[in-house]
Amino acid sequence: VKIGLVSLGCAKNLVDSEMVLALFIESGFEVVVDPEHADVIVVNTCGFIDSSKKESIESIIEMAKYKKKLVVIGCLVERYLDELKKAMPEVDLFIPLRQYPKMKELINGLFPKETINIELSPFRRYLSTPWYSAYLRISEGCNNRCSYCAIPIIRGGFVSRPIEDLKKEAALLAAKGIKEVVVISQDTTRYGTDLEVKTNVTELLKMLLSFKEFAYIRLLYLYPDELEDSLIELIAKEPRLTPYFDLPIQHASTHVLKAMRRRGDKEFLRSLILKIRDKVPHAVIRTTLIVGFPGETEADFRELLDFVEDMKFDHLG
């Protein structure tokens, strides 16, 4: 039986796709690059912004033309399950995020006899990244309630993975020859604060550094006001920690930041960026911005423009 998978959205969604591929491959399925030649097509959707939703819907419609077994999973399904069921009867199975623990049983319901014989697990992944690199997802969900963002609605509240589980997964990646680990989360700097035995992302990095196989370790998605000095100092002194700060500020106007329900203000952001530049002179700082936010004035936009020019970010998104 041949499986084809279309994975849309962010790196965190890609990790889910890798777990789904392993579910099929370790049950004897063959992966094909062209879904047209597959017996089962899985579309892992994104439901974050309008363009992502449109891309997901177009992909489902395109895959339905082949009319094999069509399974649709992911954030769009979690957010719009009832609407999708009504609008797309050609889909054989929708699996929202909340039903991922039952994925084995749900998929087996499509076949006359049990076909999938293992459970979905972060310790079983069919890596789709380049041979030397892999993502390590350290948590799920988000507790920030930014006014423009649906992630907490889709993925739920922030839940850290136990550091013992992450150490086990890191060992599996090291055994596969992975040289670069990219640490991902909805809110990486919050890691460990919700665990029974409190820890933090700095301690997590120290654990990853204990694996000599990893030549590079990179962090993504750092919420500005949770970025501790200890983390900056560790990145400054450890050559295997990539001096890359993925620091989404979204805006610089205090008025707009309040409307966005973002913590911190322009002066806090300025002092943080200058601190990073001072402690890590070779740092690369990337940020993301939202312009045209409801209520943003021309003065707000000019304030943001001046701030960006002043801070000299290395990359903007």
What annotation goes with each model-predicted range?
Residues 1-191, 230, 241, 245, ...:
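Proteins enriched for Cys/Gly/acidic motifs involved in redox and nucleic-acid/cofactor modification
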Residues 8, 145, 149-156, 217-225, ...:
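Conserved strand-turn element in the central/C-terminal portion of the radical SAM core barrel
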Residues 47-52, 178-207, 211, 223-230, ...:
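Conserved glycine-rich "GG(E/T)P / GGGxP" loop and the immediately following alpha-helix
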Residues 73, 137, 184, 218-222, ...:
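A cross-family glycoside hydrolase active-site/sugar-binding cleft signature
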Residues 175, 202-203, 207-216, 228-287:
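Radical SAM/AdoMet-radical enzyme domain recognition
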Residues 179, 215, 314:
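Short acidic/polar active-site loop segments enriched in Thr and Asp
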Residues 296, 310-313:
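Contiguous mid-protein beta-loop-alpha structural module that forms a pocket-lining wall or clamp
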